[in-house]
Amino acid sequence: MKELPKVYDPHEVEKKIYQMWLDGNYFHAERDPDKTPFTIVIPPPNVTGQLHLGHAFDETIQDILIRYKRMDGYSTLWLPGYDHAGIATQIKVEEKLRNEGKTRFDLGREGFLDEVWAWKNKFGNRIVEQLKTLGCSCDWERQRFTMDDTCAKAVRETFVNMYEKGLIYKGHRIINWCPHCTTALSDAEVEYVEKPGHLWHVRYPLSDGSGELIIATTRPETMLGDTGVAVNPADECYKDIVGKTCILPLVGREIPIVADEYVEMDFGTGCVKMTPCHDPNDFEVAQRHGLEEILILDNNAKIINGGKYNGMDRYEARKAIVEDLEREGYLVKVEDYSHNVGTCYRCHNDVEPMSSEQWFVKMEPLAKEAIRVVEDGEVKFVPERFTKTYLNWMYNVRDWCISRQLWWGHRIPAWYCKDCGHMTVSREDATECEHCHSRNIEQDPDVLDTWFSSALWPFSTLGWPDKTADLDYFYPTDVLVTGYDIIFFWVARMIFSACEQTHKPPFHTVLIHGLIRDPQGKKMSKSAGNGVDPIEMIDRFGADALRFNIITGNSPGNDTRFYVERCEAMRNFANKLWNASRFVMMNLNVNDCALPERLELPDKWVLSKFNTLAGEVRENLDKYELGIAAQKIYDFIWDTYCDWYIELAKARLNGSDAEAREGAERVLLYVLTGILKLLHPFMPYITEEIYQAIPHECEALIIAPYPKYDEALSFPAEEQSFELVMDAIRAIRSRRADMNVPPSRKAKVIVATAEKDTFVSGAPYIQRLASASEVEVVDAGYEAAPGMVTVTTHSARLLMPMAELIDLEAERARLNKELEKARKQLEAQEKKLANESFVSRAPEAVVNAERERAEKAKALIANLEGSLKELG
């Protein structure tokens, strides 16, 4: 048994213990046929990212589950890895080049990709090392990357497989375009933000001169692409003009008026301008009515096909067009109008709906199975309320745009023949056209959406499409831990991808957590200046303190507020456990964890309490109630074990009865070992360090069996009996504190009770913990002599001679002095309140405050008078 240092140094311990775990190969998952597998794949962080509090929260939850299952005898695989993060990484590297006075086009595609790989190799390991600092027990030997050969093979197989089934197609549709990132985005990558704007009401003259239409728009610049006006066929106001044409203001183009049920009669004027290339609904109407399509924005959101406005930025063009409309008499009125504007989830610039030829995943056939596995309970969401969120999205899902106009990512495996125009889609890099065998072919320049490869993560990381031993043993995985903000981005796509490619759901449980927010409830971010660096928190307080802080008080699906002060409190908790462990070790003469044959009342009490705790914590962990489990362990260690049982054991440890001493030692060690095991998944470093220092049955705590409820250690009667003794101790302590009696001043305690056997057994503990000179247990009907202080619990009357507690004359003088002061204060307040001028003229809040002070003074006087009466 080694000695623990006087002061706990988390930094020294964490480095040493993590290396011990690595050297022992404890994180490695074996395919053991005699064990049940338990698998979690880590949500892959961006390859060039660094750890933020969201990661720390997400990874701590996963590590707790993995450590719990590992200790519970499962063959646990926590598979780590990182994402190539197409847009994010390309932007980072382009910023670097910009600082060097270069662009990616200066380098060319291959040269730029060399730069990105160099960037990845330089910064890619940073977040891995930070995850290790946090204590993550991942199987680092199985680490994956979404662009490695294994994942790339899975991406190719999936793309070609789905293309051959008609589930992936290339088509001309309205997509979301980010002019800043210069790429298409999927619907899930668009964040809608309410922004103040205007509603411009514009005259569209009828071509035959018989009148005009008034049309309202929030985007006058898109008028340049108008190719029609639509009204509702049931709208009586416009039935006579359907089939006519009107003149497009400023442009002079004649455009048809069509009837379509898409138009809402009660919105605006009931007339809607049709811009098929820049609105998804207009596009659908145009398809039904054969309207012309005119694209008026280029990839940088500058005007094209717009006459004199060509080359203008979209917002510059808006201003110019509004001025021209007003000057030429087309502008009727302008109203303030707030509306939702689509923005890029990555750069937060406004996105443009644009007609474009892109690659899409046909979602309707895939959604059916993805809906079924959730509705049938094969995949469960925790909390259950997120099932509705998922299903609502899946029932209304649109085809997924998967092509991105980037260079970094999985390039689309399609080659175009320059001779015959045929497109070849292939699992291997094509060298010739499959139709005419010409070698004059060129690969599609676009790459796949990052989320396409991420959607395959649960099975591509295990070797799919090859039939590997890992895939056979560890798949499907068990739990996916993620935030509610990426249910659409990632969770839904993993489910339908897995169902399609492996014919199995990728996991059985989706554990949804909330976001980490600042103390005011605001979302944390660098730009807002309220972000907290988890590595800085680890440097200040230790990884265990950070982990325990972000877990305690948290519940699945709910946001949590982060307070730095709580990290300090959790460090203090670690210190309390450390000091308690040192105390046990300094008093330990046994070298095994066996319980004594004879258990005294406090022993049965603490063992029964611990036994209940073990059962409850298991139940909480199995229900993913990690915050509740952590709080229960905290309360038991701080209150039950440290503040009560250690103090109760001191009498036997310092006594002359060798058997009683050994019994206390064994129970202290047994419970300490148990709480180290219960706490280990939450605070792995300090628990492993202490475990290695005390007598232990396993080579490492990380693989020690997790405590279970044991019927043999359930002592409900003794537990209840000892709670009566504890109630008495608390009551005596409270009364002594009220009377300002120092602990050093002893006084006899008489216990009048019907539970005589219980209190006779508990008398030594009352004497030690309630500063009693002696304890006498008498019948419940005992009549107290004059001059006794009486405290009552629901099972006993506790009597103490007043004279033994305090100097009666000095206390009487002190109380009289305070009473005189309180009466003078009350007299002044009542005089003030009797002044009609004060009551009628002073602000109501001031008068109420004065009345409140008067009531408090009355209560104080009553208490002081009661105390004086007790003194006699």
Could you describe each region identified by the protein language model?
Residues 2, 7, 16, 20-24, ...:
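Residue patterns forming the tRNA-binding/recognition surfaces of aminoacyl-tRNA synthetases
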